[in-house]
Amino acid sequence: MANPQGSPPGISRRGFLRGATVLGGGVVVAGWGLSPWIGNVFHRRGTFVYPDRPPMWPGVDTTYSVCKQCHSDCGIEAHVFGGVLEKLDGNPYHPNATEPHAPYSLDPAVVALWPAPHSLCPRGQAGRQTVYDPYRITVPLKRTGPRGSGQWEAISWSMLIKEVTEGGHLFAHVKGEEHRHVSGFRELWDGGQARFRSIDPANPDFGPETNGLVIYWGRAEAGQADFLTRFGHAFGTINVFPHVGICDLNHHVATQESLNGMGGVAMLKPDIPNAEYILWFGENVTEANFPMQTLGRKLVAATTDNHLKYVMIDVRTGNGNLHANRWVPIAPGGDGALAMGMIRWIIDQDRYNGEYLARPNAHAAQAAGEPNFSNATWLVITDPGHPHDGAFLEAAEAGLVPTSASTAKEPVVVDPGSGQVMPASQTQAAALWPQHGKSGSIKVNGIVCQTAMQRLYTETSRNTVDEYAKLAGVSAAVIVSLAHEFTSHGRKAVADFYRGVSQHTNGVLAGRAIMVLNFLLGNVDWTGGYIMGGGAGDYLGKTPGAPYPLDTWPNQPAHIPSGVPISREGAFYEKSLAYQAAQKEGRSPFPAPRPWFPFGFGI
């Protein structure tokens, strides 16, 4: 056989491989003789730490826990020898780390032999480094210099408890703060009387003085967050905040508002094992998101057997493209434009799930075998001169029932057969495009209206597909091809998004546009579609028969304290006494003294 180009003369490929094998074996033998030296590669302060000491060796303790290196919360298996954490592995009992996972009934003495790999990603493996990091904070720190100076001292837990409880001149040692008094829990609580005094007499709707306590934490587990919240509410403060505002609030608001806030659902995910086509918008699967290794494992399995195609829509390429069918390098912040362009094309081409969208209520959906319904057929007031312009038309406004009727505020739809308007609850199907096509409108009791579906089309029609493509930084052909493929798999296509989309000033609106793509297919809660998770642990014992019913403990305050959060989240400025007072005095209530975030939480 001729030598490959560039190979030294006289050496065949077979000969090279034979020689390399012998040489490799010699290196192994030589290395074995130097094994004491090799061991020194794996050491900690001069003590041997065998990197792969079998967990069944005498003296090795194995503890099962959960990884906190990221928010995936994968199960871990910690191997400890001589009081030193030697190695972290995946927990064979945990579904994030092992698939299929071992049953809890399996004896830990033999679970190491469980056939399915129980893996842990490199970041999880680095948990050992975190444990022994010399800069790891293990005690409370107290500021010793001006704010922002970075000057701290370590204090004991007992000192922390005393100072936050009793208060006082806690920073008398800091220049400029010698006489600053800091209230402690005891002073703020005032024997429980502060719960009955207004924190702002001019604005009593701001709540009691106990709202002066603000509890804010970063990332906390659900159980930890439950107890922190429970303590704050028992104390009498509404100001209890998790980390959401610096995490992905835009994503959660977009999801909740798209689902009408139902059940507090802030997260849906594609049913990867059963889906046929997934659009990942700004979601760095296989490298990030959570649970990262679980998503990656399922994604690789689904693409390996060729039943799943997926597209990465992202400003950068990454490991997710190794198995992707396509990468769409979108302009930063252009995700919403891409989604709107797809919506426009889908409606123009009538490639939406009309039967699903026509179901106007839960009973109609159930009768049709649908797990949910949409408001696509509900009439929306589109009269700029009407005081409720942009709101859903109500039965009383339509002249269908008296204003005193229990159904006065019920939404209104158009019967597709007769063209008559009726309450949404009184029909099994309603018209998406009543009388005048996709862009038309109708008058009901003198009020100009369109269906929600028509309003969606009117908004998307503000731009052409070419214009949306320019805003997104892609070609019009890309939008058309994505929309065509997306609507070619029935309910087994999903559009999902995360931080790459939502961490922009237009993040909520872009996220809602992507949610609409799923609604046009009617894929929510369908096999292969967009689904909810399985829930979480019952940390406070809310389930009947729970051994520790902490949520119903006798004599504890069970209600959320009154008032407006200091972050102004979850509250409407227009409903505040300050707004109403300005109106009564003939003053403009705008601009508000501070920004309010009625749809936000955890800010």
Where are these predicted regions, by residue range?
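Structured secondary-structure scaffolds
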Residues: 468, 479-482
